[in-house]
């Protein structure tokens, strides 16, 4: 017999593990990421809706979730098990939009609150009442689960019937293959909340892929499972049952209890109740699991232990997916950093070669001071430096885009494209740098005797030409020394070089950081991987 040793330390470890799973982010579209996101959702659903609530309240009723494909007759089966219509059934698809939980009146308190399925708003329907609760009563049944207030767009309708034994609750879930995505998602969440998985299929669909995926998942978790082969024509009953049993055996599920419900007039359209005799074996099996202590312990304990043991495999898989996300984010980040680092080196090399002193700037320099004023020379040098930086940023962005196109993960962030505002930002930064250099020249001239002091704008023009002209403007340094003295010129050029370096680095760093901002906003960090493994390690020690 499977037994559970429920200690506070185990619950604390599970809660910590749950928080670590919730903190996982998988935003990058890597191969395997959709599966990892599904694993994360399933883990949260099982921890929030099943494992933690079950371990905290071992005495709570056994919850059997009725799941299956479209048209399998789940709602009709639930209605027939309880002896009256509690769940909407019919030929229109999808039928079960709002899941319905049915329990004995004495057990209603277990589900009126948010002990399980905390994200679903309760809609309480006492026995015999035909209308939904008023808004005021509905508000009273709202609670707060692990994720906060329940979603008002997702409801769990609760019915009580005295025909169900105490200690047993049935939950009619939406179709697992519903065309409505929200229904499929909800069906998966509800199944994760089950002590007993009741898989319903039909004679015409028992070999379909989706029901078998559910069966294999139950086997993977070692959950307590029962299958119902529904709506089987009488003339095919023996043959279909034999074939279905053979399929289960080949899948390693030969020991799973199987129940067969024949095709009956009441099955047509899903509007009637099946005779009690048609569902009596299943009813008796479920009731035994609720009322017999040993059978109950076996059913509940097997599912809980199965989920616990599955964490040893699923958590490392999730941690591996987190690591892959971080590795991809590092590759994307490195491509940006390397592109801008390369262009930064290229800009400095171009400055030393005198690339700024070209075109209009070179013409102005050659005409200075006879045909060109200091302001005109400064304007042309600033414009040339701005153009050099704009070309560097554009080249870096092209290199980044080329590298990112080879990365599947780059699909989560926009590829760098020409930014019409980048030129304006760079121009503003260069003008600010120019103003700082002008202030530097003014300060130096201010320390000189007024009679011999040159004009500050002339000093600034020669200084900028010397800083940006490279080999082509060697005369600028000599002329600057003639104007203010050798020592002052050296001191001024040293301070000016520091300003050039810092401002160029700042411009490129600003543009680089703007390219990294969308990636940084995804918050793909390495910490969650280590935290997942650490939380699993603590849990394993507490088991």
Language model features with spans:
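Non-catalytic alpha-helical scaffolds
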Residues: 1-84, 169-170, 187-188, 192-196, ...
């Amino acid at each position: 017999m499977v037994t559970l040793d429920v200690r506070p330390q185990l619950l604390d470890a599970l809660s910590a593990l749950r928080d670590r799973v919730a903190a996982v982010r998988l935003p990058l579209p890597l191969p395997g990421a959709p599966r990892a996101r599904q694993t994360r959702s399933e883990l949260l659903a099982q921890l929030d809706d099943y494992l933690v609530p079950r371990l905290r309240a071992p005495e709570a009723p056994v919850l059997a979730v009725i799941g299956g494909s479209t048209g399998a007759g789940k709602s009709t089966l639930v209605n027939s098990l309880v002896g009256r219509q509690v769940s909407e059934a019919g030929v229109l698809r999808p039928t079960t939009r709002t899941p319905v939980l049915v329990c004995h009146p004495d057990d209603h308190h277990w589900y009126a609150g948010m002990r399980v399925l905390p994200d679903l708003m309760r809609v309480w329907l006492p026995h015999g009442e035909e209308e939904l609760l008023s808004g005021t009563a509905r508000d009273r049944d709202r609670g707060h689960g692990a994720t906060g207030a329940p979603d008002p767009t997702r409801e769990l309708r609760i019915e009580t019937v005295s025909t169900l034994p105490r200690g047993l609750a049935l939950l009619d879930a939406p179709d697992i293959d519903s065309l409505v995505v929200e229904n499929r998602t909800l069906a998966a969440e509800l199944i994760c909340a089950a002590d007993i998985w009741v898989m319903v299929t039909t004679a015409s669909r028992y070999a379909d892929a989706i029901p078998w995926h559910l069966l294999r998942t139950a086997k993977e978790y070692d959950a307590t499972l029962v299958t119902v082969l529904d709506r089987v024509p009488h003339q095919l009953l023996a043959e279909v049952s034999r074939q279905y049993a053979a399929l289960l055996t080949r899948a390693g599920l030969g020991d799973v209890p199987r129940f067969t419900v024949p095709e009956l007039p009441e099955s047509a359209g899903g509007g009637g109740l099946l005779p009690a005799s048609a569902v009596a074996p299943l009813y008796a099996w479920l009731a035994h699991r609720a009322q017999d202590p040993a059978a109950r312990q076996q059913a509940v304990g097997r599912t809980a232990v199965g989920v616990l043991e599955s964490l040893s495999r699923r958590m490392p898989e999730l941690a591996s997916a987190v690591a892959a996300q971080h590795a991809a984010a590092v590759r994307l980040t490195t491509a940006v950093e390397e592109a801008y680092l390369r262009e930064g080196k290229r800009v400095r090399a171009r400055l030393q070669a005198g690339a700024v002193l070209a075109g209009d700037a070179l013409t102005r320099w050659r005409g200075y001071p006879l045909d060109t004023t200091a302001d005109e020379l400064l304007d042309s040098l600033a414009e040339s430096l701005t153009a050099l930086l704009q070309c560097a940023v554009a080249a870096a962005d092209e290199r980044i885009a080329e590298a990112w196109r080879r990365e599947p993960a780059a699909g989560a962030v926009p590829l760098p494209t020409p930014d019409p505002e980048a030129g304006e930002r760079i121009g503003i930064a260069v003008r600010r740098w120019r103003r700082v250099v002008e202030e530097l020249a003014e300060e130096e001239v201010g320390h000189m005797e007024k009679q011999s002091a040159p004009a500050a704008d002339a000093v600034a023009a020669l200084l900028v030409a010397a800083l940006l002209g490279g080999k082509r403007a060697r005369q600028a340094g000599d002329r600057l020394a003639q104007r203010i003295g050798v020592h002052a010129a050296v001191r001024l050029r040293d301070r000016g070089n520091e300003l050039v370096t810092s401002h160029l680095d700042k411009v490129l760093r600003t543009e680089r950081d703007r390219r990294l901002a969308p990636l940084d906003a995804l918050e793909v960090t390495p910490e969650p991987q280590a935290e997942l493994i650490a939380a699993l390690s603590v849990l394993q020690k507490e088991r």
